[in-house]
Amino acid sequence: TLRFVQISDSHLGFTGAPNPDVTATFGHAIDLVNNLGYTPDFVIHTGDLTHLSSPEQFDQVKQMMSGLKTPHVFTVPGEHDSIDDAGQKYRNAFGAGSVGDGWYSIDIAGVHLIALVNTLNLHKLGHLGADQLEFVKKDVARLSSDTPIIVFSHIPLFAMYPQWGWGTDDATQALSYLRRFSSVTCLNGHVHQLFSKTEDNVTFYSGTTTAYPLPHPGDGPAPKPATLPAGKLRDALGIREVSYARGETALALKETALQ
């Protein structure tokens, strides 16, 4: 069995009424992970580690995540992690072992993990680009079709709400290379709320955040940080435990709020 935790959208460096102390809530999330009663095989942060891509913010998030009790910590960048330099500072801090602009794959416990970067060259939607599509195609060519595949990205790889940029314009091409596999799951951040959808052989799960909620799709003109009534913020924040038992096609997910 593979067991891991997804955390996302910590936005270290954010200040404002929606969450006056994003460092405290991210620290709370890390404490939750460290007190699950077991050691996860890895922890994945699905992007927007920082709010403004500053070296200090990357140092802080790296320092905090070094306290996670797990053998591996993986990350993918969000658009907030590549504000002014196409992700160079992010890759300096977290890019070890990655190729291209920060993508990579790894095998753990018989499961094939693919970490993608769809937050560079943003026009309206997330974008993978030709180099990364070629990487995915070659990466999975050697795998047998019963290999379980889990894909991590920041922006959803499905059209959750394109009007707000909640989708990836060339994701269909990437997913076409995964069509022959019996178990394909995509986990993303970016939208700061739980959402799931199944299309063909792929199940998509958007994760929550440790920073602040965003409105539901179409609720208002734009996805601006939402300020909740006093005492309600931590109910909207959380972590996600994921487990996979060999031979299954579906992952088991458990969402835990930061109460």
For each feature predicted by the language model, list its residue ranges:
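Short, well-ordered beta-to-alpha junction loops that form the rim of enzyme active sites
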Residues: 118, 152-157, 189-191, 256
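Surface-exposed cleft-lining segments at the edges of enzyme active sites
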Residues: 14-16, 49-50, 119-130, 158-163
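Extended active-site neighborhood of metal-dependent phosphoesterases/phosphodiesterases
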Residues: 54-148, 170-185, 197-200, 208, ...
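Active-site glycine-centered loops adjacent to acidic/histidine catalytic or metal-binding residues
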Residues: 9, 47-48, 78-79, 154, ...
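Hydrophobic beta-strand anchors of alpha/beta hydrolase catalytic cores
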Residues: 4, 43, 113, 149-150
